[in-house]
Amino acid sequence: MRHIRIISPSSAIDAQWINRAKVRLEQWGFDVSVGEHAYGNIGRFSATDEERIIDLNNAFADPMVDIILCSRGGYGLQRIIDKIVLPQRPKSQWPLVVGFSDITALHSLLSLNGIPSLHANMCKDLSLLPDDDITLIAEKEFLMSADCPTPLSFTSHLLPLSYHPAPHNARTPYTIHHMSHFPLNRNGEVLGKLIGGNLSVLYGLQGTPFSLNKIIEQCSEPPILFIEDISENHYHIDRMLHNLRLSGIFDKIRIPFSSMYITD
């Protein structure tokens, strides 16, 4: 039975979302444990920096943990990312980290070390989404894959519909189909390492050892950049994208792939 550890490395979360996600994951057949400080609430954060570091490092160090599910994003990982102690064992035995939003900082750290991770639903979505939600179905099948956390090969009609485990270190093909009501979209096929995550977090990591430029330097070929964000003003999105452009990032990637919910 695969073991999932739920931790809260960023903002505080209502305990009900952890508890309801835990029930659903156990119904899927997972053994689920919760980090010592996951239910905490100290101002904006789930716990102090030191306590959140302890939960992260304990989860990485525990050889029984197969998957680390971050309960929510928000803010907080950038304060502690340089204090995380990565596992001292073969990379094929590292736990798979799952999350999005602020968890992008942790994905960036793992990308720098050549470790695949999963940008996917966290506790609240795992609690509320219906069983037939396509992102939930994809996440469930991904997590239950016998070869997880090796890279996967999958095809997509805007969202993952079907996929199969790929050999370790294999490149992951990803097909994005044209949406006619978006005139700037183009059909195409691209192969490469998928990097990125939340644009605001990536922007905040610029100029640090965990920046996109540092990640791209570790890639043997131009990677695919994925970016997403929510509730940001148009001008702020524009500022962040031009920051990446002026940093030379758009000259080093194969294709930008993004999802945005922008406010006026």
Predicted regions located by residue number:
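Conserved anion/nucleotide-ligand pocket segment
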Residues: 118-200
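ATP/NTP phosphate-donor binding region
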Residues: 1-64
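Structural motif
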Residues: 32, 67-69, 98, 224-226, ...
